[in-house]
Amino acid sequence: AVQRQGLALVTRRELEVLRLVTAGATNREIAQELVLAETTVKTHVSSLMSKLQARDRVALVLLGQKVLLQ
């Protein structure tokens, strides 16, 4: 339920980042794919972790798998 509330706050760009994180891409690879600075990707990942209450990147990937399969 908490993740669902957080998901409502996720931006379109953060959703793109989540898709790539879930696919196993590194921050550098995500930055290249989305034409962003690596620090911007780190900011998006941190924001996603906060919004979705993921304690680490692995938890974020697991949440991403659930969210993206719906």
Q: Predicted regions: what is each one?
A:
Residues 1-20:
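Regulatory hinge/linker segments at domain boundaries
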Residues 7-10, 54, 69:
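Hydrophobic patch in the ABC ATPase nucleotide-binding domain
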Residues 63-70:
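Intrinsically disordered, low-complexity basic tails/linkers immediately adjacent to helix-turn-helix/homeobox/MYB/SANT
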Residues 24-59:
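Recognition helix of helix-turn-helix DNA-binding domains
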Residues 19-23, 65:
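Short, locally clustered residues in the helix-turn-helix/winged-helix DNA-binding domain
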